[in-house]
Amino acid sequence: MVKFPALTHYWPLIRFLVPLGITNIAIDFGEQALNRGIAAVKEDAVEMLASYGLAYSLMKFFAGPMSDFKNVGLVFVNSKRDRAKAVLCMVVAGAIAAVFHTLIAYSDLGYYIINKLHHVDESVGSKTRRAFLYLAAFPFMDAMAWTHAGILLKHKYSFLVGCASISDVIAQVVFVAILLHSHLECREPLLIPILSLYMGALVRCTTLCLGYYRNIHDIIPDRSGPELGGDATIRKMLSFWWPLALILATQRISRPIVNLFVSRDLGGSSAATEAVAILTATYPVGHMPYGWLTEIRAVYPAFDKNNPSNKLANTNNTVTSAHIKKFTFVCMALSLTLCFVMFWTPNVSEKILIDIIGVDFAFAELCVIPLRIFSFFPVPVTVRAHLTGWLMTLKKTFVLAPSSVLRIIVLITSLVVLPYLGVHGATLGVGSLLAGFVGESTMVALAACYVYRKQKKKMENESATEGEDSAMTDMPPAEEVTDIVEMREENE
Protein backbone atom coordinates (compact mmCIF):
# COMPACT_ATOMS: atom_id res chain seq x y z
CA MET A 1 0.00 0.00 0.00
CA VAL A 2 1.40 3.43 -1.01
CA LYS A 3 1.77 5.86 1.89
CA PHE A 4 2.17 9.64 1.79
CA PRO A 5 3.97 10.79 4.97
CA ALA A 6 3.40 14.44 4.08
CA LEU A 7 -0.36 13.86 4.25
CA THR A 8 -0.34 12.07 7.62
CA HIS A 9 -1.69 15.08 9.50
CA TYR A 10 -4.30 15.84 6.83
CA TRP A 11 -6.00 12.43 6.57
CA PRO A 12 -8.11 13.04 9.70
CA LEU A 13 -9.26 16.35 8.20
CA ILE A 14 -10.04 14.75 4.84
CA ARG A 15 -11.95 11.87 6.46
CA PHE A 16 -13.89 14.37 8.56
CA LEU A 17 -14.85 16.83 5.79
CA VAL A 18 -15.50 14.57 2.78
CA PRO A 19 -18.70 12.95 4.15
CA LEU A 20 -20.05 16.38 5.12
CA GLY A 21 -19.23 17.77 1.67
CA ILE A 22 -20.91 14.85 -0.09
CA THR A 23 -23.95 15.34 2.16
CA ASN A 24 -24.17 19.00 1.18
CA ILE A 25 -24.15 18.12 -2.52
CA ALA A 26 -26.57 15.20 -2.04
CA ILE A 27 -29.12 17.51 -0.41
CA ASP A 28 -29.02 19.79 -3.48
CA PHE A 29 -29.70 16.78 -5.72
CA GLY A 30 -32.32 15.42 -3.31
CA GLU A 31 -34.42 18.59 -3.39
CA GLN A 32 -34.45 18.52 -7.18
CA ALA A 33 -35.50 14.85 -7.21
CA LEU A 34 -38.20 15.53 -4.60
CA ASN A 35 -39.65 18.41 -6.63
CA ARG A 36 -39.73 16.26 -9.76
CA GLY A 37 -41.57 13.56 -7.84
CA ILE A 38 -44.13 16.04 -6.53
CA ALA A 39 -44.73 17.38 -10.03
CA ALA A 40 -45.77 13.87 -11.12
CA VAL A 41 -49.14 14.26 -9.35
CA LYS A 42 -51.78 14.24 -12.09
CA GLU A 43 -54.30 16.75 -10.76
CA ASP A 44 -53.49 20.31 -9.61
CA ALA A 45 -49.75 19.63 -9.84
CA VAL A 46 -48.80 23.29 -10.27
CA GLU A 47 -51.08 24.44 -7.44
CA MET A 48 -49.80 21.71 -5.13
CA LEU A 49 -46.18 22.54 -5.93
CA ALA A 50 -46.85 26.21 -5.21
CA SER A 51 -48.64 25.45 -1.92
CA TYR A 52 -46.04 22.97 -0.69
CA GLY A 53 -43.12 25.13 -1.85
CA LEU A 54 -44.47 28.21 -0.09
CA ALA A 55 -45.21 26.33 3.15
CA TYR A 56 -41.82 24.60 3.07
CA SER A 57 -39.90 27.84 2.44
CA LEU A 58 -41.74 29.56 5.30
CA MET A 59 -41.02 26.63 7.60
CA LYS A 60 -37.31 26.65 6.66
CA PHE A 61 -37.07 30.42 7.17
CA PHE A 62 -38.69 30.52 10.62
CA ALA A 63 -37.48 27.17 12.01
CA GLY A 64 -34.37 26.53 9.89
CA PRO A 65 -31.98 28.38 12.23
CA MET A 66 -32.52 25.61 14.78
CA SER A 67 -30.28 23.46 12.58
CA ASP A 68 -27.39 25.55 13.91
CA PHE A 69 -27.82 23.76 17.24
CA LYS A 70 -25.47 21.27 15.58
CA ASN A 71 -22.71 23.68 16.56
CA VAL A 72 -23.93 23.75 20.17
CA GLY A 73 -23.55 19.96 20.29
CA LEU A 74 -20.14 20.27 18.64
CA VAL A 75 -18.76 22.87 21.06
CA PHE A 76 -20.65 22.58 24.36
CA VAL A 77 -21.80 18.99 24.92
CA ASN A 78 -19.07 17.24 26.94
CA SER A 79 -21.25 15.22 29.33
CA LYS A 80 -24.65 13.58 29.69
CA ARG A 81 -25.83 16.60 31.68
CA ASP A 82 -24.81 18.99 28.87
CA ARG A 83 -26.68 16.83 26.35
CA ALA A 84 -29.81 16.89 28.52
CA LYS A 85 -29.70 20.71 28.57
CA ALA A 86 -29.26 20.88 24.79
CA VAL A 87 -32.17 18.49 24.26
CA LEU A 88 -34.33 20.56 26.64
CA CYS A 89 -33.58 23.68 24.59
CA MET A 90 -34.70 21.87 21.46
CA VAL A 91 -37.89 20.56 23.08
CA VAL A 92 -38.87 24.10 24.07
CA ALA A 93 -37.90 25.50 20.66
CA GLY A 94 -39.87 22.73 18.92
CA ALA A 95 -42.94 23.49 21.05
CA ILE A 96 -42.70 27.20 20.21
CA ALA A 97 -42.37 26.36 16.50
CA ALA A 98 -45.44 24.09 16.68
CA VAL A 99 -47.49 26.88 18.32
CA PHE A 100 -46.32 29.30 15.64
CA HIS A 101 -47.29 26.87 12.87
CA THR A 102 -50.76 26.50 14.42
CA LEU A 103 -51.22 30.28 14.60
CA ILE A 104 -50.24 30.66 10.95
CA ALA A 105 -52.68 27.91 9.96
CA TYR A 106 -55.73 29.20 11.83
CA SER A 107 -55.33 32.94 12.56
CA ASP A 108 -55.66 36.15 10.54
CA LEU A 109 -51.88 36.52 10.82
CA GLY A 110 -51.45 33.49 8.56
CA TYR A 111 -53.98 34.85 6.07
CA TYR A 112 -52.04 38.13 5.88
CA ILE A 113 -48.58 36.51 5.60
CA ILE A 114 -49.58 33.92 2.99
CA ASN A 115 -52.53 35.33 1.02
CA LYS A 116 -51.89 39.07 1.15
CA LEU A 117 -48.11 39.34 1.35
CA HIS A 118 -47.47 36.70 -1.33
CA HIS A 119 -50.45 37.68 -3.53
CA VAL A 120 -51.80 34.12 -3.89
CA ASP A 121 -55.43 33.18 -4.49
CA GLU A 122 -57.75 31.66 -1.89
CA SER A 123 -57.23 28.06 -3.04
CA VAL A 124 -53.42 28.19 -2.89
CA GLY A 125 -53.54 30.16 0.37
CA SER A 126 -55.76 27.62 2.17
CA LYS A 127 -53.64 24.69 0.95
CA THR A 128 -50.46 26.48 2.02
CA ARG A 129 -51.79 27.09 5.54
CA ARG A 130 -52.89 23.46 5.76
CA ALA A 131 -49.45 22.27 4.62
CA PHE A 132 -47.85 24.61 7.17
CA LEU A 133 -49.96 22.98 9.91
CA TYR A 134 -48.90 19.50 8.76
CA LEU A 135 -45.25 20.59 9.03
CA ALA A 136 -45.62 21.69 12.68
CA ALA A 137 -43.60 18.80 14.15
CA PHE A 138 -40.79 18.87 11.58
CA PRO A 139 -38.65 21.64 13.22
CA PHE A 140 -38.48 19.62 16.47
CA MET A 141 -37.35 16.44 14.68
CA ASP A 142 -34.85 18.41 12.61
CA ALA A 143 -33.40 20.16 15.66
CA MET A 144 -33.05 16.91 17.62
CA ALA A 145 -31.22 15.34 14.68
CA TRP A 146 -28.81 18.27 14.28
CA THR A 147 -28.04 18.41 18.02
CA HIS A 148 -26.91 14.77 18.01
CA ALA A 149 -25.09 15.35 14.71
CA GLY A 150 -22.97 17.99 16.44
CA ILE A 151 -22.11 15.60 19.28
CA LEU A 152 -21.10 12.92 16.77
CA LEU A 153 -18.96 15.44 14.84
CA LYS A 154 -17.11 16.32 18.05
CA HIS A 155 -16.07 12.67 18.30
CA LYS A 156 -15.14 12.48 14.58
CA TYR A 157 -18.14 10.41 13.42
CA SER A 158 -18.66 12.58 10.34
CA PHE A 159 -19.12 9.46 8.17
CA LEU A 160 -22.12 8.47 10.28
CA VAL A 161 -23.54 12.00 10.04
CA GLY A 162 -23.09 11.92 6.26
CA CYS A 163 -24.75 8.51 5.98
CA ALA A 164 -27.71 9.74 8.05
CA SER A 165 -28.24 12.77 5.80
CA ILE A 166 -27.93 10.75 2.60
CA SER A 167 -30.36 8.17 4.04
CA ASP A 168 -32.76 11.06 4.67
CA VAL A 169 -32.61 12.08 0.99
CA ILE A 170 -33.02 8.48 -0.22
CA ALA A 171 -35.98 7.91 2.11
CA GLN A 172 -37.70 11.05 0.80
CA VAL A 173 -37.33 9.98 -2.82
CA VAL A 174 -38.42 6.38 -2.10
CA PHE A 175 -41.51 7.40 -0.13
CA VAL A 176 -42.56 9.90 -2.81
CA ALA A 177 -42.44 7.05 -5.33
CA ILE A 178 -44.44 4.76 -3.00
CA LEU A 179 -47.07 7.33 -1.99
CA LEU A 180 -47.67 8.38 -5.60
CA HIS A 181 -49.25 4.94 -6.08
CA SER A 182 -51.46 5.23 -2.99
CA HIS A 183 -54.92 6.72 -2.47
CA LEU A 184 -53.32 9.93 -1.14
CA GLU A 185 -52.88 11.18 -4.72
CA CYS A 186 -56.67 11.56 -4.93
CA ARG A 187 -57.61 12.38 -1.33
CA GLU A 188 -54.81 14.66 -0.06
CA PRO A 189 -51.88 15.05 -2.48
CA LEU A 190 -50.22 17.57 -0.14
CA LEU A 191 -49.45 14.72 2.25
CA ILE A 192 -47.22 13.00 -0.33
CA PRO A 193 -44.24 15.39 -0.02
CA ILE A 194 -44.93 16.13 3.65
CA LEU A 195 -45.05 12.48 4.77
CA SER A 196 -41.94 11.81 2.67
CA LEU A 197 -40.21 14.69 4.41
CA TYR A 198 -41.20 13.30 7.83
CA MET A 199 -40.03 9.79 6.94
CA GLY A 200 -36.67 11.13 5.79
CA ALA A 201 -36.30 13.16 8.99
CA LEU A 202 -37.30 10.12 11.07
CA VAL A 203 -34.64 7.98 9.37
CA ARG A 204 -31.99 10.67 9.92
CA CYS A 205 -32.96 11.37 13.54
CA THR A 206 -33.11 7.65 14.41
CA THR A 207 -29.73 6.97 12.79
CA LEU A 208 -28.05 9.83 14.64
CA CYS A 209 -29.62 9.03 18.03
CA LEU A 210 -28.70 5.34 17.75
CA GLY A 211 -25.19 6.35 16.67
CA TYR A 212 -24.89 8.57 19.74
CA TYR A 213 -26.07 5.88 22.17
CA ARG A 214 -23.89 3.19 20.63
CA ASN A 215 -20.64 5.16 20.25
CA ILE A 216 -20.64 8.07 22.69
CA HIS A 217 -23.17 7.86 25.53
CA ASP A 218 -21.16 5.36 27.60
CA ILE A 219 -17.78 7.10 27.21
CA ILE A 220 -18.72 10.64 28.24
CA PRO A 221 -18.97 11.54 31.95
CA ASP A 222 -22.19 12.36 33.77
CA ARG A 223 -20.92 15.89 34.43
CA SER A 224 -18.12 17.98 32.92
CA GLY A 225 -15.12 18.46 35.19
CA PRO A 226 -12.98 21.63 35.40
CA GLU A 227 -10.55 20.18 32.83
CA LEU A 228 -13.39 20.23 30.27
CA GLY A 229 -14.52 23.73 31.13
CA GLY A 230 -17.24 22.69 33.60
CA ASP A 231 -20.93 22.15 32.91
CA ALA A 232 -22.39 24.33 30.16
CA THR A 233 -25.41 26.43 31.11
CA ILE A 234 -28.50 26.91 28.96
CA ARG A 235 -27.76 30.64 28.92
CA LYS A 236 -24.28 30.02 27.47
CA MET A 237 -25.71 27.67 24.85
CA LEU A 238 -28.33 30.19 23.73
CA SER A 239 -25.81 33.08 23.76
CA PHE A 240 -23.54 30.99 21.53
CA TRP A 241 -26.37 29.91 19.22
CA TRP A 242 -28.38 33.07 18.49
CA PRO A 243 -25.73 34.89 16.36
CA LEU A 244 -25.33 31.75 14.21
CA ALA A 245 -29.13 31.46 13.92
CA LEU A 246 -29.37 35.12 12.89
CA ILE A 247 -26.75 34.59 10.18
CA LEU A 248 -28.62 31.56 8.83
CA ALA A 249 -31.91 33.49 8.86
CA THR A 250 -30.36 36.30 6.79
CA GLN A 251 -28.95 33.74 4.37
CA ARG A 252 -32.41 32.21 3.95
CA ILE A 253 -34.06 35.58 3.32
CA SER A 254 -31.41 36.77 0.82
CA ARG A 255 -32.81 34.86 -2.16
CA PRO A 256 -36.43 36.06 -1.71
CA ILE A 257 -35.10 39.63 -1.49
CA VAL A 258 -33.10 39.14 -4.70
CA ASN A 259 -36.12 37.67 -6.52
CA LEU A 260 -38.29 40.59 -5.39
CA PHE A 261 -35.85 43.33 -6.49
CA VAL A 262 -34.97 41.65 -9.80
CA SER A 263 -38.65 41.25 -10.65
CA ARG A 264 -39.50 44.85 -9.68
CA ASP A 265 -36.49 46.17 -11.63
CA LEU A 266 -37.88 44.65 -14.83
CA GLY A 267 -41.41 45.85 -14.07
CA GLY A 268 -43.02 42.43 -13.63
CA SER A 269 -42.76 41.77 -17.37
CA SER A 270 -42.02 38.48 -19.13
CA ALA A 271 -38.33 39.43 -18.84
CA ALA A 272 -38.77 39.55 -15.07
CA THR A 273 -40.30 36.07 -15.05
CA GLU A 274 -37.42 34.82 -17.19
CA ALA A 275 -34.84 36.42 -14.86
CA VAL A 276 -36.37 34.79 -11.77
CA ALA A 277 -36.49 31.46 -13.62
CA ILE A 278 -32.78 31.81 -14.49
CA LEU A 279 -31.98 32.52 -10.84
CA THR A 280 -33.99 29.47 -9.77
CA ALA A 281 -32.15 27.25 -12.25
CA THR A 282 -28.64 28.59 -11.65
CA TYR A 283 -28.61 28.70 -7.86
CA PRO A 284 -28.46 24.91 -7.16
CA VAL A 285 -25.93 24.39 -9.98
CA GLY A 286 -23.78 27.35 -8.92
CA HIS A 287 -24.01 26.27 -5.29
CA MET A 288 -22.69 22.74 -5.84
CA PRO A 289 -18.95 23.49 -6.34
CA TYR A 290 -18.68 25.77 -3.29
CA GLY A 291 -21.58 24.90 -0.95
CA TRP A 292 -19.56 22.22 0.85
CA LEU A 293 -17.03 24.85 1.95
CA THR A 294 -19.46 26.01 4.66
CA GLU A 295 -18.77 22.72 6.48
CA ILE A 296 -15.17 23.89 7.08
CA ARG A 297 -16.43 25.83 10.08
CA ALA A 298 -16.86 22.51 11.94
CA VAL A 299 -13.16 21.66 11.52
CA TYR A 300 -11.67 24.08 14.07
CA PRO A 301 -14.02 23.14 16.96
CA ALA A 302 -13.53 19.43 16.23
CA PHE A 303 -9.72 19.41 15.97
CA ASP A 304 -8.21 22.44 17.70
CA LYS A 305 -6.08 21.29 20.66
CA ASN A 306 -6.56 24.58 22.50
CA ASN A 307 -10.27 23.82 22.90
CA PRO A 308 -10.65 22.27 26.40
CA SER A 309 -13.73 20.34 25.34
CA ASN A 310 -11.64 18.36 22.84
CA LYS A 311 -9.49 16.73 25.52
CA LEU A 312 -11.96 13.88 25.89
CA ALA A 313 -12.59 13.39 22.16
CA ASN A 314 -9.10 14.00 20.76
CA THR A 315 -6.84 11.60 22.62
CA ASN A 316 -4.69 10.89 19.54
CA ASN A 317 -5.07 14.19 17.73
CA THR A 318 -1.98 15.18 15.70
CA VAL A 319 -3.65 18.06 13.84
CA THR A 320 -2.39 21.57 14.59
CA SER A 321 -3.75 25.01 13.78
CA ALA A 322 -1.23 25.32 10.93
CA HIS A 323 -2.51 22.08 9.38
CA ILE A 324 -6.09 23.38 9.53
CA LYS A 325 -5.11 26.64 7.79
CA LYS A 326 -3.25 24.84 4.99
CA PHE A 327 -6.11 22.37 4.57
CA THR A 328 -8.62 25.23 4.34
CA PHE A 329 -6.54 26.95 1.65
CA VAL A 330 -6.35 23.74 -0.41
CA CYS A 331 -10.14 23.31 -0.13
CA MET A 332 -10.66 26.85 -1.40
CA ALA A 333 -8.27 26.27 -4.31
CA LEU A 334 -10.06 23.01 -5.20
CA SER A 335 -13.46 24.73 -5.16
CA LEU A 336 -12.20 27.61 -7.31
CA THR A 337 -10.77 25.11 -9.81
CA LEU A 338 -14.10 23.24 -9.98
CA CYS A 339 -15.99 26.49 -10.52
CA PHE A 340 -13.77 27.67 -13.35
CA VAL A 341 -13.76 24.24 -15.03
CA MET A 342 -17.55 23.91 -14.80
CA PHE A 343 -18.58 27.47 -15.63
CA TRP A 344 -15.83 28.85 -17.89
CA THR A 345 -15.18 25.82 -20.12
CA PRO A 346 -17.30 26.24 -23.29
CA ASN A 347 -20.62 24.29 -23.31
CA VAL A 348 -19.97 22.54 -19.97
CA SER A 349 -22.33 24.68 -17.88
CA GLU A 350 -25.01 24.46 -20.59
CA LYS A 351 -24.77 20.65 -20.60
CA ILE A 352 -25.07 20.51 -16.80
CA LEU A 353 -28.23 22.64 -16.89
CA ILE A 354 -29.79 20.61 -19.69
CA ASP A 355 -29.02 17.23 -18.06
CA ILE A 356 -29.76 18.06 -14.40
CA ILE A 357 -32.45 20.76 -14.47
CA GLY A 358 -33.97 19.74 -17.80
CA VAL A 359 -33.98 23.16 -19.53
CA ASP A 360 -33.53 23.75 -23.26
CA PHE A 361 -30.27 24.99 -24.83
CA ALA A 362 -31.51 28.54 -25.47
CA PHE A 363 -32.44 28.97 -21.81
CA ALA A 364 -29.15 27.36 -20.69
CA GLU A 365 -27.19 29.96 -22.68
CA LEU A 366 -28.89 32.73 -20.68
CA CYS A 367 -27.57 31.14 -17.48
CA VAL A 368 -23.88 31.22 -18.47
CA ILE A 369 -22.99 34.72 -17.18
CA PRO A 370 -24.73 34.29 -13.77
CA LEU A 371 -22.96 30.94 -13.34
CA ARG A 372 -19.60 32.55 -14.12
CA ILE A 373 -20.23 35.07 -11.34
CA PHE A 374 -20.73 32.11 -8.99
CA SER A 375 -17.08 31.19 -9.72
CA PHE A 376 -15.92 33.89 -7.29
CA PHE A 377 -18.07 32.77 -4.33
CA PRO A 378 -15.53 30.24 -2.89
CA VAL A 379 -13.19 33.00 -1.63
CA PRO A 380 -15.62 34.86 0.70
CA VAL A 381 -17.35 31.60 1.70
CA THR A 382 -14.03 30.01 2.76
CA VAL A 383 -12.93 33.09 4.71
CA ARG A 384 -16.28 33.22 6.50
CA ALA A 385 -16.34 29.48 7.29
CA HIS A 386 -12.75 29.29 8.55
CA LEU A 387 -12.98 32.34 10.81
CA THR A 388 -16.44 31.36 12.06
CA GLY A 389 -15.05 27.98 13.11
CA TRP A 390 -12.19 29.68 14.99
CA LEU A 391 -14.62 32.02 16.78
CA MET A 392 -16.86 29.06 17.62
CA THR A 393 -13.88 27.37 19.28
CA LEU A 394 -13.37 30.46 21.45
CA LYS A 395 -17.15 30.67 22.05
CA LYS A 396 -17.09 34.27 20.77
CA THR A 397 -19.92 33.99 18.26
CA PHE A 398 -21.55 37.21 19.48
CA VAL A 399 -19.09 39.22 17.34
CA LEU A 400 -20.57 37.57 14.22
CA ALA A 401 -24.00 39.22 14.61
CA PRO A 402 -23.09 42.49 12.80
CA SER A 403 -21.95 40.51 9.72
CA SER A 404 -25.51 39.34 9.02
CA VAL A 405 -26.81 42.92 9.20
CA LEU A 406 -24.05 44.17 6.88
CA ARG A 407 -24.81 41.39 4.40
CA ILE A 408 -28.44 42.53 4.04
CA ILE A 409 -27.40 46.20 3.79
CA VAL A 410 -24.81 45.49 1.06
CA LEU A 411 -27.24 43.17 -0.75
CA ILE A 412 -30.05 45.73 -0.90
CA THR A 413 -27.64 48.56 -1.76
CA SER A 414 -26.26 46.54 -4.69
CA LEU A 415 -29.77 45.68 -5.90
CA VAL A 416 -30.65 49.39 -5.88
CA VAL A 417 -27.40 50.83 -7.30
CA LEU A 418 -26.34 48.28 -9.96
CA PRO A 419 -29.37 48.88 -12.26
CA TYR A 420 -28.15 52.48 -12.66
CA LEU A 421 -24.87 51.01 -13.95
CA GLY A 422 -26.70 48.97 -16.59
CA VAL A 423 -26.82 45.65 -14.71
CA HIS A 424 -30.22 43.92 -14.81
CA GLY A 425 -31.90 40.52 -14.62
CA ALA A 426 -30.23 37.41 -13.19
CA THR A 427 -26.80 39.05 -13.46
CA LEU A 428 -28.03 41.74 -11.08
CA GLY A 429 -29.27 39.09 -8.65
CA VAL A 430 -26.14 36.93 -8.55
CA GLY A 431 -23.83 39.96 -8.55
CA SER A 432 -25.68 41.40 -5.56
CA LEU A 433 -25.50 38.05 -3.76
CA LEU A 434 -21.72 38.06 -4.30
CA ALA A 435 -21.49 41.61 -2.94
CA GLY A 436 -23.46 40.52 0.13
CA PHE A 437 -21.11 37.56 0.67
CA VAL A 438 -18.04 39.80 0.37
CA GLY A 439 -19.52 42.32 2.82
CA GLU A 440 -20.38 39.59 5.31
CA SER A 441 -16.94 37.94 5.04
CA THR A 442 -15.21 41.31 5.48
CA MET A 443 -17.14 41.96 8.69
CA VAL A 444 -16.35 38.44 9.95
CA ALA A 445 -12.64 39.09 9.23
CA LEU A 446 -12.76 42.39 11.14
CA ALA A 447 -14.51 40.66 14.05
CA ALA A 448 -11.86 37.93 14.06
CA CYS A 449 -9.07 40.55 14.09
CA TYR A 450 -10.76 42.27 17.05
CA VAL A 451 -11.00 39.00 19.00
CA TYR A 452 -7.42 38.05 18.05
CA ARG A 453 -6.05 41.35 19.37
CA LYS A 454 -7.99 40.95 22.62
CA GLN A 455 -6.74 37.36 23.01
CA LYS A 456 -3.15 38.44 22.32
CA LYS A 457 -3.37 41.30 24.83
CA LYS A 458 -4.88 38.96 27.42
CA MET A 459 -2.05 36.43 26.93
CA GLU A 460 0.59 39.18 27.25
CA ASN A 461 -0.97 40.39 30.50
CA GLU A 462 -1.09 36.82 31.85
CA SER A 463 2.57 36.27 30.89
CA ALA A 464 3.56 39.51 32.63
CA THR A 465 1.63 38.51 35.76
CA GLU A 466 3.23 35.05 35.77
CA GLY A 467 6.67 36.68 35.39
CA GLU A 468 6.07 38.90 38.42
CA ASP A 469 4.82 35.92 40.45
CA SER A 470 7.87 33.83 39.54
CA ALA A 471 10.20 36.72 40.44
CA MET A 472 8.55 37.02 43.84
CA THR A 473 8.79 33.24 44.28
CA ASP A 474 12.54 33.24 43.50
CA MET A 475 13.27 35.75 46.34
CA PRO A 476 14.15 34.00 49.65
CA PRO A 477 11.83 34.64 52.59
CA ALA A 478 12.68 37.49 54.99
CA GLU A 479 13.49 35.04 57.84
CA GLU A 480 16.08 33.25 55.67
CA VAL A 481 17.76 36.58 54.77
CA THR A 482 18.01 37.48 58.47
CA ASP A 483 19.54 34.09 59.32
CA ILE A 484 22.16 34.49 56.57
CA VAL A 485 23.17 37.95 57.84
CA GLU A 486 23.47 36.67 61.42
CA MET A 487 25.65 33.73 60.30
CA ARG A 488 28.00 36.10 58.43
CA GLU A 489 28.29 38.34 61.50
CA GLU A 490 29.13 35.34 63.72
CA ASN A 491 31.84 34.20 61.28
CA GLU A 492 33.36 37.65 61.27
Swiss-Prot record:
GO terms for cellular component: extracellular region; membrane; plasma membrane. It comes from the Eukaryota. Residues 107-131, 180-189, 348-350, 427-429 are extracellular. InterPro entries: ANKH. Residues 1-85, 153-158, 211-326, 372-403, 453-492 are cytoplasmic. The keyword Protein transport does not apply. The chain crosses the membrane at residues 86-106, 132-152, 159-179, 190-210, 327-347, 351-371, 404-426, 430-452. Keywords: Cell membrane, Membrane, Transmembrane, Transmembrane helix, Transport. Residues 458-492 are annotated as: Disordered. It is a multi-pass membrane protein. One of its GO terms (biological process) is bone mineralization. The keyword Transmembrane helix applies. Transports adenosine triphosphate (ATP) and possibly other nucleoside triphosphates (NTPs) from cytosol to the extracellular space. Mainly regulates their levels locally in peripheral tissues while playing a minor systemic role. Prevents abnormal ectopic mineralization of the joints by regulating the extracellular levels of the calcification inhibitor inorganic pyrophosphate (PPi), which originates from the conversion of extracellular NTPs to NMPs and PPis by ENPP1. Regulates the release of the TCA cycle intermediates to the extracellular space, in particular citrate, succinate and malate. This is Mineralization regulator ANKH. It comes from Rattus norvegicus. The lineage of its organism: Eukaryota, Metazoa, Chordata, Craniata, Vertebrata.
